[in-house]
Design a protein with these regions (language model features):
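RNase H-like nuclease fold core
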Residues: 150-238, 245, 450-453, 457, ...
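Acidic/histidine-rich catalytic cores and adjacent linkers
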Residues: 52, 57, 61-64, 222-225, ...
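Short, conserved DNA-binding cores of transcription-related domains
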Residues: 1-103, 109
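Mobile genetic element proteins and their domesticated derivatives, centered on retroelements
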Residues: 43-44, 58, 98, 138, ...
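Inter-helix linker motif
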Residues: 245-264
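Short helix/loop capping segments that flank catalytic or ligand/cofactor-binding pockets
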Residues: 53, 106, 137, 185, ...
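Short, positively charged, Gly/Tyr-enriched micro-motifs
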Residues: 75-173, 179-184, 222-225
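Conserved phosphate-handling catalytic cores of large alpha/beta enzymes
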Residues: 263-275
Length: 468
């Protein structure tokens, strides 16, 4: 268990210098001195020292070596001419037992992250490439296996390092938190809105009270005046707990977004007979923004799909009515009038199924009526840029190929520069302009899809998720 695997005579100064990792010494077993140049066996610099290891728990030096475990990493040697030399780095890590507090501990290292199969310098290169390409494509370029267990680790490390280099976040007066779904996973998006400027603040890994609480802990809570929320119970509870003095609102944008989702459910159900180009996007647009060609496509479709026609006509009437003064009873009344729209769209004697998809909107309005009324009482509503920003983010997420959260998070937070602001001589970051963010996200999607179509890039994830 505690037997030493190497003797000091096997230390290779040249290979240690080539490896250039301050913590490690390269040693060579007799059978790999000349034949296995791509394999570097290493030990900690203290391996041949007679000094006792210090227990990290009680600081005692009354410790003894218990075992040695070999850990294999992929690494890339530093090069002045840009040449890539990828090696197998095998680190023989020692474990110790403290005779005082009885804890077992290992040699502490910082050349690689816990749970990652790449050294930090290689993982940083892989993470940088994965910001704009698929992880598998980048790993293939470097000639290393695409470790599924490591991708999250390397992207989290890259994001953490980059954010740590930025100035602190300036807490915005107005927050917008909405909960989009990316391949069936809910990833809350946090925006700030200041006049007509909408900026991305962060993306959270899940919609839970604990996730929100962690994010809110980084804000100056007294500075937040208004928070626009989605009808999400976890979000609702977390916001009221963290910001008891702020105004909590549900905006017109949010209500219309959920109504569009209900219309989308109808479109999906009636979709076998719907021949409209980009049907979800086109059928959800206000009629005044439709081209003549789109109007003809919709007209032909509605003549065949009478249930969809009832939902579509009702939706268009609602958009017109909400351009004026509206309130919760008015929208609930619109939902109650849906059977009349079905009757107007049905042929004589035709019995169409009720539009139960919109019952969800009624539930939302009844549960969150105080937050909607708080919004309606505002003297100045949020700029139209908010609705455009949310729609642009949803569209870009819908088009982006599947990736795990850590990749998506890094792509959204690191590909566009954060805007900065100086307050009382101190520099702060204020977020990422959403228009630049979505433009970059769409560029990344185009790059990935183009390479797939050309057969240059094949991305197979561990799961086979899809939109729901």
């Amino acid at each position: 268990m505690g037997r030493r695997l190497f003797q000091e005579v096997y230390v290779s100064p040249d290979r240690t210098k080539a490896l250039d990792l301050s913590e490690l010494i390269v040693v060579s077993e007799r059978d790999d001195l000349e034949t296995k140049n791509a394999i570097y066996h290493t030990v900690h610099r203290s391996y041949f020292s007679k000094e006792k290891a210090v227990c990290p728990y009680c600081k005692s030096t009354n410790t003894s070596e218990t075992k040695i475990r070999s850990r294999k990493y992929k690494d890339i040697l530093p090069s002045k001419n840009g040449e890539r030399t990828v090696i197998d780095l095998i680190y023989h890590q020692r474990y110790f037992r403290c005779d005082e507090c009885k804890h077992v501990f290992n040699e502490d290292i910082d050349f690689a992250e816990e749970g990652c199969r790449y050294t930090n310098r290689l993982s940083d290169l892989l993470a940088e490439g994965t910001l704009t390409q698929t992880y598998e494509k980048v790993c293939k370029e470097y000639g290393v296996p695409a470790s599924k267990t490591s991708v999250g680790v390397i992207m989290r490390r890259r994001l953490r390092m980059k954010i740590d280099q930025l100035p602190p976040l300036k807490t915005p007066d107005n927050l917008v938190i909405f909960v989009p779904y990316f391949y069936s996973n809910a990833y809350p998006v946090v925006l700030s809105i200041n006049g007509g400027a909408v900026r991305l603040i962060d993306v959270l890994s899940e919609s839970s009270e604990s996730a929100y609480a962690v994010f809110f802990s980084g804000l100056e809570r007294t500075r937040v005046k208004r928070i626009y929320i989605d009808p999400d119970e976890q979000l609702h509870n977390a916001v009221y707990t963290a910001f008891p003095d702020a105004s909590i609102l549900m905006s017109e944008e949010c209500i219309l977004r959920y109504i569009r989702e209900c219309l989308g459910d109808v479109i999906k159900r009636e979709g076998t007979r719907c021949f409209v180009y980009k049907r979800y996007h086109t059928l959800c647009k206000a009629e005044k923004y439709l081209s003549r060609s789109e109007q003809k496509q919709i007209e032909r479709t509605l003549n065949r799909c009478h249930r969809l026609a009832g939902a579509y006509n009702a939706y268009q009437d609602l958009l017109v009515s909400m351009e004026g003064k509206w309130d919760v009873p008015k929208i609930i009344g619109w939902i109650e009038d849906l059977p009349e729209y079905l009757g107007d769209s049905a042929n004589e004697g035709e019995d169409l199924e009720e539009l139960i998809e919109f019952d969800f909107v009624r539930d939302i309005l009844e549960l969150y009526e105080p937050q909607v009324n708080e919004y309606l009482a505002l003297d100045q509503k949020p700029a139209a840029a908010l609705a455009s920003a949310v729609m642009a983010i949803l569209d870009s997420l819908h088009e982006m190929p599947f990736c795990i959260f850590d990749v998506l998070h890094a792509r959204m937070m690191l590909n566009v520069d954060h805007e900065l602001e100086i307050v009382d001589g101190k520099k702060y970051r204020t977020g990422i302009p959403v228009n630049l963010l979505t433009e970059k996200m769409n560029d990344i999607t185009d790059i990935i899809k183009t390479k797939k179509e050309k057969g240059e890039d094949v991305y197979e994830s561990e799961d086979k998720p899809g939109w729901s």
